[in-house]
Amino acid sequence: STDEDPKYEDYKEIEILNSETPIWKKDKNDLTDEDYINFYQDQHFGFDEPISWLHFKIEGAVQFKALIYIPKKAPFDYYSKDYQKGLQLYTHGVKIMDRSEDLVEDAFSFVKGVVESDDLTLNISRETLQQDRQLRVISKQINKKISRHLLDLQKNEPEKYADFFKEFGNNIKMAIYESFGANKEDLQDLLLFYSKNEDKLISLREY
């Protein structure tokens, strides 16, 4: 191609956000449930409505914004080796990864969503990301937030949580098993068990 007539393929394909403020950068008080659900479906995170979502920002040594969804149903390939966990990762308004696996632990591989931090550099590679200290800090905060959100759901909306657990509970159990119990302390309160008369699911604290 010439300088006068450049071809699109000469440019690095990066997705830059348009001029409208993206949903995760907006104040959650200005957003409706419909806004969140529409974004979830527009991004093809799922066809139905999510069970719930968490929208937050962290300000500290590392700053970031996140919008994370708990799906209602597992995708068709969820239990196959083809399934890829991870959250979309943005920095400075540019998507640098479509699925950043290092942001969520295996126990929460079902979550969908977006994270943006301007503390990351634009030209960071997948290999560099795995070693990035700031990304590890972000990941730790995200997993803590997801765990707390699920515990709140269990406490405040037990029926909704029971539906979630029937869909994804095996994944949490597997994460405890595969870590040889190393993360049992963090995850055991999320587990549900059938009561003695097996008519309903209850938590370990209720058991």
Regions found by a protein language model. Name each.
Residues 1-207:
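Conserved GHKL (Bergerat-fold) ATPase module
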